[in-house]
């Protein structure tokens, strides 16, 4: 049997959250005709010279028109459903990934696989990604607040649009054999904001924030609903370890991480996250 978990997805029972549109952008000069396609913007000039269509790949700059809402895409080549709720399916509606009342309002990094719906278990292949990291030790619950503002100020200073998810990497916090929270003091964590493309800023240090490239990797992932924190991570890891026990041809290849897709204004019951373990086939 495969590990399974159920979540409330009845929109009549869970309020459908709405994100306040607060992200300000710099003024954009109006043009007579502008059309947008997936990942590109076409505009026509109005001077006396012959009109020229200009195609520009979206850079991900916060001041660029449409920076906060590039079109989401399905990525079946990067995702394989292997357990949990095998019938759960996400949809793309109104420019957002959705599952029941849960939604993802911000764009994913370019090339990232689609999100795993709550209750489903997927094998997923992630490309390399450039990210801004804030690392510390101690309580990751406190760290989620402590790390957010240095990271937010970093992307604000560099005019980089917010993406989703916010990533939490955990070291020494969970028993590698069971996924249960370990009873020890030597725990540390890293919170990361992910760049949509690596062209946005170079690697290096910006105060307490480090910009670095994370290599490509394969993970076993379960989608979750619920308040963000170590409790939902522990629950998800227990289910992933259950799947691994039934599939001994895979082994754990790294520390666990969590993807947080929503901001604090979203009701806890419909917050969308993923709990992931890097894995590989045994030789």
Predicted regions and their residues:
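A solvent-exposed interaction/effector surface
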Residues: 2-283
């Amino acid at each position: 049997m495969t590990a399974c978990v159920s979540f409330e997805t009845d929109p009549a029972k869970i309020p459908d959250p709405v994100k306040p549109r607060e992200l300000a952008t710099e003024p954009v000069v109006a043009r007579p005709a502008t059309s947008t396609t997936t990942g590109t913007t076409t505009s026509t000039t109005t001077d006396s010279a012959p009109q020229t269509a200009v195609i520009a790949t979206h850079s991900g700059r916060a001041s660029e028109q449409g920076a906060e809402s590039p079109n989401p895409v399905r990525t079946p080549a990067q995702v394989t459903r292997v357990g949990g709720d095998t019938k759960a399916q996400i949809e793309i509606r109104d420019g957002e990934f959705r599952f029941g009342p849960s939604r993802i309002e911000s764009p994913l990094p370019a090339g990232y696989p689609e999100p795993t719906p709550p209750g489903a278990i997927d094998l997923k292949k992630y490309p390399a990604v450039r990210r801004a990291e804030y690392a510390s030790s101690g309580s990751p619950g406190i760290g989620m607040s402590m790390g957010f503002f240095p990271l937010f100020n970093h992307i604000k200073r560099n005019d980089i649009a917010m993406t989703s998810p916010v990533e939490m990497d955990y070291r020494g916090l969970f028993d590698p054999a069971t996924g249960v929270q370990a009873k020890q003091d030597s725990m540390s964590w890293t919170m990361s904001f992910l760049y949509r493309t690596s062209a946005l800023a170079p690697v290096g240090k910006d105060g307490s924030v480090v910009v670095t490239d994370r290599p490509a990797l394969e993970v076993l992932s379960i989608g979750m609903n619920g308040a963000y924190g170590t409790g939902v991570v522990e629950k998800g890891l227990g289910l992933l370890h259950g799947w691994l026990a039934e599939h001994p041809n895979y082994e754990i290849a790294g520390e666990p991480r969590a993807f947080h897709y929503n901001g604090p204004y979203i009701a806890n019951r419909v917050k969308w996250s993923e709990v992931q373990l890097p894995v590989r086939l045994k030789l």
